[in-house]
Amino acid sequence: MSFFPELYFNVDNGYLEGLVRGLKAGVLSQADYLNLVQCETLEDLKLHLQSTDYGNFLANEASPLTVSVIDDRLKEKMVVEFRHMRNHAYEPLASFLDFITYSYMIDNVILLITGTLHQRSIAELVPKCHPLGSFEQMEAVNIAQTPAELYNAILVDTPLAAFFQDCISEQDLDEMNIEIIRNTLYKAYLESFYKFCTLLGGTTADAMCPILEFEADRRAFIITINSFGTELSKEDRAKLFPHCGRLYPEGLAQLARADDYEQVKNVADYYPEYKLLFEGAGSNPGDKTLEDRFFEHEVKLNKLAFLNQFHFGVFYAFVKLKEQECRNIVWIAECIAQRHRAKIDNYIPIF
């Protein structure tokens, strides 16, 4: 069997890999974006999107069109495509696709807790959640007053339970604790997903490990930068860093000691690809933000996943590229709706 793994890969997964590569061919090109940024109204945008693989996905929407409606329909289309693949997947691809949804579940839980903290109703918050991360117990999140209650009453029967072990405490849920929970969940999630991919091995591990290593390192950089000027201690900050990136262990130890942005940048200098990202970012008008530089690098890594065949990385890469495409379209739509065209070109090109 080990001599021709691609033969056995295709038995269970060949149809879906062919499907996802076909869907990837419909990702918007640079020429499509050049057309979109020339639109004067959202109706023009709708018309241009009809000539792409999006087709008439906005056909049933009444005028006047809004950015939030476009955003909702983009997510719906992406979720329909993803669920079709999940419904036809055999193990271990089914578990791999489930792992992709867990990050959206984490974001949804945090959004609901934060909204509840600010006295927003659950009925108002649930529509704002990402449909790829929906789960049955979501609407009960508002009853939890502490992380322990959140776990015991709601999350214990969800896939997130495995990531929640380090978050359980009797402290009240305030904004600082919620951010700590978010980052602790993501740390456990990324480390678990990384371990799963290494166990799958082969081309899947070759494609996915660099992507997840970058995601872990990006979170470590952002956690460090966002912690400056807050009450978060250096010891607590270090506990939030995922240990599956290229920064582990020396880089993370240096980030744990960092006191300002320059010291974070000095850590990045030891890693050539991260050094380039920090050097290309600035805070002056016209400069790209560090977040944009991270998004660009993420797109580059996800595109690389399509260079090899017979692996699961293409499914993750497709979802992330579509997610970036949705952000791009919404950004352009916002600029058109607000008549703020000066920054309309600040999207992240994909192809």
UniProtKB/Swiss-Prot annotation:
One of its GO terms (biological process) is vacuolar acidification. Gene3D superfamilies: ATP synthase (C/AC39) subunit, domain 3, V-type ATP synthase subunit C domain. The keyword Membrane applies. The keyword Membrane applies. It comes from the Eukaryota. GO terms for molecular function: protein-containing complex binding; proton-transporting ATPase activity, rotational mechanism. InterPro entries: ATPase_csu/dsu_sf, ATPase_V0-cplx_csu/dsu, ATPase_V0-cplx_dsu, V-type_ATPase_csu/dsu, V-type_ATPase_csu/dsu_dom_3. Ubiquitous. The modification Phosphotyrosine is found at Y270. Subunit of the V0 complex of vacuolar(H+)-ATPase (V-ATPase), a multisubunit enzyme composed of a peripheral complex (V1) that hydrolyzes ATP and a membrane integral complex (V0) that translocates protons. V-ATPase is responsible for acidifying and maintaining the pH of intracellular compartments and in some cell types, is targeted to the plasma membrane, where it is responsible for acidifying the extracellular environment. May play a role in coupling of proton transport and ATP hydrolysis. V-ATPase is a heteromultimeric enzyme made up of two complexes: the ATP-hydrolytic V1 complex and the proton translocation V0 complex. The V1 complex consists of three catalytic AB heterodimers that form a heterohexamer, three peripheral stalks each consisting of EG heterodimers, one central rotor including subunits D and F, and the regulatory subunits C and H. The proton translocation complex V0 consists of the proton transport subunit a, a ring of proteolipid subunits c9c'', rotary subunit d, subunits e and f, and the accessory subunits ATP6AP1/Ac45 and ATP6AP2/PRR. This is V-type proton ATPase subunit d 1.
